[in-house]
Amino acid sequence: MPAVRGKSKSKAPVTFGDLAIYFSQEEWEWLSPMQKDLYEDVMLENYHNLVSVGLACRRPNIIALLEKGKAPWVIEPSRRRWGPESGSKYETKKLPPNSCHKSGPSICEKPTSSQQKVPTEKAKHNKSSVPSKSKKEHSGKKSLKCNLCGKTFFRSLSLKLHQDFHTGERSYECSTCRHVFRQILSLILHQRVHNWNKSYECDKCGDIFNKKLTLMIHRRIHNGKESFHHEKASDSCPSLSLHRNNHTTDSVHQCRKCGKVFSRMSSLLLHKRSHNRKKIQKYNKYKRGFKKQPVLVHKRVCIGKKTHESKKALIQSARQKTCQSENPFMCGKCGKSFSRISALMLHQRIHTSGNPYKCDKCQKDFGRLSTLILHLRIHSGEKQFKCSKCEKVCSRLSSFIQHQKIHKRKKKLIACKECGKMFGGMKNLKVHLNIHSEEKPFKCNKCSKVFGRQSFLSEHQRIHTGEKPYQCEECGKAFSHRISLTRHKRIHSEDRPYECDLCGKAFSQSAHLAQHERIHTGEKPYACKICKKSFAQRISLILHERSHTGERPYECNECGKAFSSGSDLIRHQRSHSSEKPYECSKCGKAYSRSSSLIRHQSIHSEETP
């Protein structure tokens, strides 16, 4: 059983022996890895706290072993090994470390030099390991044998602790909650739960600490007392030399897991907690631990599948298989997924009319506070973004950024060879080409179109359903994609930074300017692969290709009739609703199609002389 060192007197200073706990080899082996780590952290922290206030002058062997990552158990002489304390015959319950109750003076009275090797449990005894006289003096002690398994022990407490495992006896009871434990270390670890909220208050400044030792260190600030000064006590205490290491730039404490070094033990203890927080996935077949990406490769090795040839393919596959687990909160209306429920709640305000932020002047509602702040600038007339080149002032940062693109050098548009989409630079084109090269496991059930991500498929399916979850706050117009809403909002802003050099017409987007310039140049970069017919706009090519394939993705919910374009579906739906949005300004007659209104207006033009 581990023995707690003898308690100090009421007026005596705190020593390392008052805080230390020692184990035999058998007791140490019974501890779990988590208990060993906690024991190591607590012992090192207590020792270095004592060193910082000058209360520990000699460096115990057990501290040297712990800092080197070696087992700190007390060795019994029959095992013929050497531990942190010399021999089991030494009474560990009443004497400080490195002392013998029979031989008198401490064997390790003198501190070991830096070149001396600290003996460990792996080092065997030789003639110079332990004095022969001391060895003979303790050889007469009888060993104790377990009646159940025949194992021998040299301490009655060790035998009692061993027999508890046969009987299942739990002899250590918590005085607070009456919970019973088999080992004293388990009881000590358990009592930290009750003592966690225990506070120690400074009677001078009122600062509160959760440890009594920390309060003692703090009180030295008010007392102005220091045990050792750099100028006076040069070599009087090894604790001072150890304390001086904190002021040097040399890193002396190294993490055994990652190799990182620190100048202070407290920093190392804080760093070691970061390793414990890391969650590592375990594959049940071999009980091996992996991080996210390697576990995918390991699973394929176990089931006989080929691994990915490149890291890029591995990341793409992991993204496809874990997209739902990484974003567990999915919107029930548009299918978009989020990693946090707060982001989902903020997103759902787009679909609902419950906009919590209201303008006091025009009573308009907004879903986000940032949108309301931008809206208030309309009433106040505030314009804070001023262009340094042309003195133009914009009320929004996005409009200011778009305006600055006018003064930048125009980039030559580069077309994608796969789909014909235009880009302003090679960098953007390379990013776009990844769409064509990656795997597309998500397939649409209606038109058989494939996509690389689930979110792309969800956005595409809105074409068939006609769902438009994104609504403009200015005019109420709805869109099926967020990017379409973003582009539409630029119509309401007065800023049109992209101007045609030939006719002076201005546009809010560079893509619209590029399409307009083709009217002057006659360029038609989009060619049909079947009939070789060319078009100036990409959407015109897409609509034309549907005449060859017969694809009609837009279906009417009322009668089931399908159309190749969304505008044809909108015109058809007006036949069910009898809606006639096109009204003549002269006679008030209304039509469901704009072409019918144009033909009607020709009648009024003929009547005029």
Swiss-Prot record:
Segments of skewed composition (Basic and acidic residues)? 81-94
Region annotation (Disordered) ranges: 81-140
| Lineage, uppermost ranks | Eukaryota, Metazoa, Chordata, Craniata, Vertebrata
**Alphabetical list of InterPro entries matching this protein:** KRAB (IPR001909), KRAB_dom_sf (IPR036051), Znf_C2H2_sf (IPR036236), Znf_C2H2_type (IPR013087)
| Gene designation | Znf667
Name assigned to this protein: Zinc finger protein 667
* Localization per Swiss-Prot or TrEMBL: Nucleus
GO MF, one annotated term: DNA binding
The UniProt keywords, alphabetically, are:
DNA-binding, Metal-binding, Nucleus, Repeat, Transcription, Transcription regulation, Zinc, Zinc-finger
